[in-house]
Regions:
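Short, mixed-charge, low-aromatic patches
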Residues: 2-5, 158-166
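Structural motif of enzymes handling amino- and sulfur-group chemistry
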Residues: 125, 134-138, 161-191
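Conserved PLP-enzyme active-site core in the AAT-like
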Residues: 1-142
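A generic structural signal for well-ordered coil/turn residues at beta-strand boundaries
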Residues: 114, 131, 148-150, 166, ...
Length: 191
């Protein structure tokens, strides 16, 4: 399985791919253009080469605001190609995603609606403490199937369907990080 990222992508992507078991040899770094954006033609070529060599493209990770240069990958073109090729598309908007709250910066996310998941970090621009992140997913059921476990001691007595956020990530529990962002929005508004 191959993971495709821009050569400008954040190092956490490589770390995550290693943790997920892909191995560094399956992380394909796609060249960037003069604006530090992923070269879509190079991406298409690498995917075609890998398919011809018997590899399976699993995921493309596009970046909306690279940490080192602020580069913005052409999400619309990348999303269209991922849809054609049936490849999962994740958008790493950790650094610049908070700017999407402002109408004048929403052009950056053109094409992001074609992504399967997107993450941004309010702690970088929106006055929240460290580790406040927002993660959008198109298909929550796929995420839940990945992380869900239900040993006897976690079974509840309710017959009413509830959302168990323990099934949305590796830890079974976590701090209420969303409260940080809620307080900022309540205190300062969205305008």
């Amino acid at each position: 399985l191959r993971v495709y990222v821009s050569q400008e992508a954040h190092s956490s992507i490589e770390q995550g791919a290693k943790i997920a078991g892909y191995g560094v040899e399956n992380i394909v770094k796609v060249p960037a253009d003069a604006q530090f954006s992923m070269d879509v033609e190079a991406l298409k070529a690498r995917i075609a080469e890998d398919r011809a060599a018997g590899h399976t493209p699993a995921c493309v990770i596009a970046t909306l605001g690279t940490t080192g240069t602020g580069g913005i990958d052409p999400l619309k073109d990348i999303a269209a190609h991922c849809k054609t090729e049936n490849i999962f598309l994740h958008v790493d908007a950790a650094w610049a995603g908070s700017a999407l709250l402002l109408p004048e910066w929403q052009w950056m996310a053109e094409g992001a609606k074609g992504a399967d998941s997107l993450v941004f970090n309010p702690h970088k621009w929106l006055m929240t403490n460290f580790d406040c992140s927002v993660h959008f997913v198109r298909d929550k059921d796929a995420l839940i199937k990945t992380f869900s476990i239900l040993p006897e001691y976690l079974k509840g007595s309710t017959n009413v369907p509830v959302t168990d956020f323990r099934d949305w990530g590796v830890p079974l529990g976590r701090r209420f990080r969303a409260l940080k962002l809620w307080f900022v929005i309540r205190s300062y508004g969205i305008n």
